[in-house]
Amino acid sequence: MKNFYYFILILLFFNEVCYSLKDGEIKLHLIPHSHCDSGWTSTMNEYYMGQVKSIISSMVQSLNVESNPPRKFVWSEIGFLEQWWDDMPIEIKNDFIKHVKNDRIEFVNGGWVMNDEACASLESVIRQLSNGHKFIREKFGKQPESGWQIDPFGHSSLTPTLQAQFGYKHVVLNRIHYELKKKFKEEKNLQFKWRGSPEGVGPKSDILAHVFDDFYTSPPHMSFDGYNFLAYGLPRLTMEMIELARNRSVFYKSPHVLIPMGGDFAFKNAYKSFEQMDQLVASINGQHANGESNVICQYSTLADFFSDTINWHNENKVSFNYYDSDFFPYADDSNTYWTGYYTSRPLLKGYERHVSSKLRSAEILSALQNDEKYYPNQLLNASKQVSILQHHDAISGTSKKHVVQDYFSRLQKADILVSEQSEKLLASALSQHSPTKLDIIDIGGSLNFPKNNDAISFILFNQLSWSKEELISIKVQSVGDHGESLNSPTNNACPYVLAQEDFLNEIEIDCSPRSDFKSDQSDDHKEFIQIDFPAKLKPFSSKLYYLKRKSNPNKSNWVLPKTNHFNSIENSIYTANLDENYLIKSLKSKSSRHGGGANQITEINQQLLTYSDIGGAYIFRTNKQVFQPPRQVYSTFTYIGKFYQEAQSILQDTHQISNRNGYYYYYGNNQQQQQQQQTISTFNYNSIKLINTGNEMIDKKINFNFHIRGINGTTTINRFTTDIDNNRELYSDNGLEMMHRKSISSQSVEVGRETQSYYPTINSVYIESQSTGKRFVCNNDRSRGVSSQGQGCLEMALHRSLTYEDGKGLEIPAIDESSINARFECYLDEVPSNSQQSNGGGGGDDIRKQSINYQHKFQIYQGQDSSYMSSKSFMLKPLPEFIHILSMERSGPRSIKLRIHNIENNNQSPITFDLNGLFSFIKSIKSIKEYNLSLINRFVDNNIDNIISSHRSIVGKNLFPIKDTPTRFNPINTKQTKITLYPSEIKAIEITYH
């Protein structure tokens, strides 16, 4: 009897699946899924062992049951899947492969994780997606066609731009501003063609977006991991689902309704869940077959759902509307803006950026080998660890403390792997013989003299594909072999001399006695000597230097700290006027190209300020005006060297902070418990540095460094208040392009609403005045929140430590008392003439190039044997100015893979260049293959012309004109070595060579 019952269910199901919808009928597409965070309240490994391993196994076993209606499942997080794959016997793996082949398991997103969209960089998003696609291609021969960004806290326009170029045609979104979601539902615009790069690559960034009308979890009472089925009974659940279908169908133009079935770590008992869902599906379809309902139901993948939806739109000639911006900030009510996580856990954000840059450099070094040696496995392992950090509860800083520590451990593991491999790779690239090992010197590290050795050698390496100049700052030990101090202020000369290539080629340096800053002002300061000198390196090149102890060097400037107060510091570009705290008051320009003209004064008025923050890891929420804590200047130092002038101050602030011995919650306007207050003093280190090398592109940038710690219950910001008439608008980047950001009002912002005008920035932010043509730009060392809270104002959030919990799942406050060095560089510039238009924001090419320079500093390696070290250039000719090799890695003994990016202004023409004769290690090019951005899957036409669009904006007017170039599919001619790139376009290729 039971078998007969299931036979009837199968007949009913297949009858409905093949059924062609009639007018007035609704088709429910149930999408079974399990959203498995790669760390959040538990670590990734804790989640895997405790839940995810059994979820995947249970799901596969449930799909093996053929006696039920055809079950389907979508899976996203490939990092978890690799762990599971390595644990499983071949029989279960074969079951999984079978279900993928039969389209019953679909990979959606297919990244290593589901990446955050506000804090992850362009390079890191590409990396984590590529690692996931590599696993999918190698194990299953498939590639994803749909994005599944259901949990990030707001959506970036970088998402459609990248995913479309990874071969995706559709993406599912969830968290958009509550007012927008309401508007889209009312106007049936929850589905639209999303163009991520309207001024850049245009059609190449188009994707069909679907926004959940509610949330990514199962509808009420429809989660079948628990007891809902028994509690409510099949008849009631059937009627509720039919009513749900009718209610939700009014939000869409087509009668196809997507219903997510699952949620966080759902399907722990997939067999039970599917058995109950089978009965629900059969009951719904049975009522339809009996003429009692207009709703039919099936399990679907995203491919099924989008295919049916697009076909209906085409058959009925109903177009999708259009959107060409992003979805920041995200809010779920008027008092809850998810703008805090842009800045939360800044130490983690900064360390991830540092390790990612090192990893990129190591991958490039792997391609530069001349003896066919490369180390792909170690670098791939490091790449996977870095990819985990892109998860939307990792780089966002929204995990519990022990999970954050796990992320640090993963980064440290990757850091060690990358250091070990890059030391070998550079040594191998410089010599075909058996070189001794090089030691990479990280930021904050120092060069070390072996005992009884008066000279050491080191190498600088430029990992960028254009020539670059920097002012190099290197720490050197301050104690001699016999324990004598080398940096005593009573010394009258620098104890070191620096030479390039050999000791006959001595170069001029600034040499200064220093000590590390300790935020607690303890006495255990580490003393050192700092060597500063300008260095210019060719693209992908190394340069050899020698440092030697010498008592009276001719070209070493001994720069002693001055303790008397300076009102200003200067270089060839600016005079920077300082206030009593050694923060900038104004800039006087010495050049007509900076600040509006020679002798023109631009008000800057820098402040280090504090918000009282009653939000949590996700939510930035204030309850009083931003303020400066009571402050004293503890000490000041000024260094006046040949190549720089630097003003340093130590500021002692007094804070009234909340007692952190209890946990407190804030919901809406109600504080559940009054916190006890205590008074503490903190010491903040501030440095402002003007560089004087004679290179205008370097010297125009003012270098800032704040050494600060998190203060409980606060967000610490740096604010510039300028005389630039910006109408409280600013531009911040999404990792690829600058985005125009409007503030909520042109008037002064009332308390509690400041956070509504906060936006994320990955690398750069600026304000400008179209009337005066003046622009103020800042490049950042990590992602952070930025805003313009008043006319001429630009502020950047630097640190947060929370004593309230915002009710978003962490359950405990995100207390973060870590000390960080928050670095950024800022400069005055002119608004390019080609941006004198309604949208503004031109000149993004130079801003992008300068931010890349800031992100990827020269790397320093100390050598043990200089006979195997040399200055060497691996590029034989320069690329055009704005052509950037985004990534490069060895793919085989005689092949390399590259992503090449045209970062030029979107108003410019395409650029053509020749790969032939570009690299010193390539004698001749044998063949070229083109891939999509994954560098895993070939570049094929993922045409979406069948998705008809009105090009009518779903929000106001279109922000940008509709452009049709470059075309979505524009393959290169692989029979020749010339490449053409449109502005903002990225091409991914593999070169096989002789």
Curated annotation (Swiss-Prot):
Catalytic function, reaction form: Hydrolysis of terminal, non-reducing alpha-D-mannose residues in alpha-D-mannosides
Localisation: Secreted
Catalytic class of the enzyme: hydrolase
Predominant location category: secreted
Gene designation: manF
Organism phylogeny: Eukaryota, Amoebozoa, Evosea, Eumycetozoa, Dictyostelia
Residue positions the entry lists as glycosylated: 247, 381, 554, 712, 932
UniProt keyword terms in alphabetical order: Glycoprotein, Glycosidase, Hydrolase, Metal-binding, Secreted, Signal, Zinc
Cofactors, names only: Zn(2+)
Protein name: Alpha-mannosidase F
GO cellular component, one term: lysosome
Cofactor binding remark: Binds 1 zinc ion per subunit.
GO molecular function list: alpha-mannosidase activity; carbohydrate binding; metal ion binding
Catalytic site positions: 151 (nucleophile)
Residues given in the record as Zn(2+) binding sites: 35, 37, 151, 392
InterPro entries xref list: Gal_mutarotase_sf_dom, Glyco_hydro/deAcase_b/a-brl, Glyco_hydro_38_C, Glyco_hydro_38_cen, Glyco_hydro_38_cen_sf, Glyco_hydro_38_N, Glyco_hydro_38_N_sf, Glyco_hydro_57/38_cen_sf
